[in-house]
Amino acid sequence: MEMLIKNAVVVSPADKLNEKTDILIKDGVIAEIGNGITSDGEIIDADGLCAVPGFVDMHVHLRDPGQTHKEDIITGCRAAAAGGVTSLLAMPNTNPTTDSPEIVKYILDKAKDADSRVYVAASVTKGLKSEEPTDIDAVKSAGAIALTDDGRPVENTKYLSDAMKKAPKLGMTIVAHCEDLFLADGGKINEGEVSEKLGVKGIPAGAEDCGTAREIALAAALNEPIHICHVSTKTSVALIRDAKRRGVKVTAETAPHYVSLTDRELLRGDADYRMNPPLRTQADVDEIINGLCDGTLDAVATDHAPHTPEEKADFVKAPNGSIGMETSFAVCNTYLVKTGRMTLSQLVEKMSVNPARILKINAGTLSVGANADVVLINPDEEWTVDVNKLHGKSKNTPFKGRTLTGKVKKTILGGKIVFSD
């Protein structure tokens, strides 16, 4: 099977490409990139569009198994495709927890028919309880590529340390949710002016910062790598920046909502703006953007966390989390590229190249022989987020009703069109 993409501006920083050219796809892989290519296969005229390597979202909650009323593997990957996400890392806070070979295999088997490539993160500890370590060899053999207790920190530092020493030998990535639960103390939103005004218990920024400091200290002491999730505070950015200067093997991600929204959104009393870590202050947002631009923060990942409208109905009692895969590119393009803080090529590094490198997966490139995971985007098209037109089961997006710039027009997975706008 052949497919020829004509006249696209190919933006692939891993391949040092940023030019108008053609892409020939054969049998699911990139066969040729150049001008004047001809083919008897399907022709896509991409004049006016950019072609980028499929986005890699390294932080996704698919809710499958156990919470499939919120999302499942098939619907989650449908949402991924609509957002240009062709590879994703599924978090282990499922029910049962992804802490056994059986659950890893269940996810991978179900994902074979999905519209995105699904990679699995198993838990560091059984049931995310920090009471007993997961059998890392067993989950690795079943196909897991990463380890995390995301949704909560690994409270037992010895178990985290042991996992950090073992994971590199198996080619696995340790992904750390940084939070001091004693400091967080059941808070619901960022501690500060807004929480005081609403009379809602806050989570101090220090809860995240203490967790970040612990993980960096471990990585430094062990001389082993660690990846830090969903960075939301200016102090965590400073800690990571300093650690990188000292040669600590730390990488980090933030999420689209942390570069675009502040805790003032919570004044609406809408739980779709509640996530963990919570939305912070404008000073935090500014420093998150600085961290992305100067390389302190390596990646953008959504922390896609679906919940039903019923679950999100009560502002204080609602679970944390928001969906994000369908809006991720548009939000980052709007708030980072269109504001002049970074180029489209630099954004592709954060959304494709670096996540693939951190996870050690075959993605983030359009080089000859690579998987033909290609996204056609119009970086200048404006659109308004309509929750009724989203592709997943849940609608809890903090960007509902917002007009964004940058639209995914087609998503190609292994040479097959899985989404078309």
List each language-model region with its residue ranges.
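Divalent metal-coordination and catalytic microenvironments
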Residues: A8, I23, G28, G48, ...
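N-terminal metal-binding scaffold of metallo-dependent hydrolase/deaminase domains
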Residues: M1-T38
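Active-site metal-binding motif and surrounding structural segment of the metallo-beta-lactamase
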Residues: G36-A51
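C-terminal cap of metal-dependent C-N hydrolases
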Residues: D314, N371-D421
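Metal-associated gating/positioning segment near the N- to mid-region
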Residues: L49-A111
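His/Asp/Glu-enriched, well-ordered alpha-helical/loop segment
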Residues: K197-P225, D272, D294, D298-V300, ...
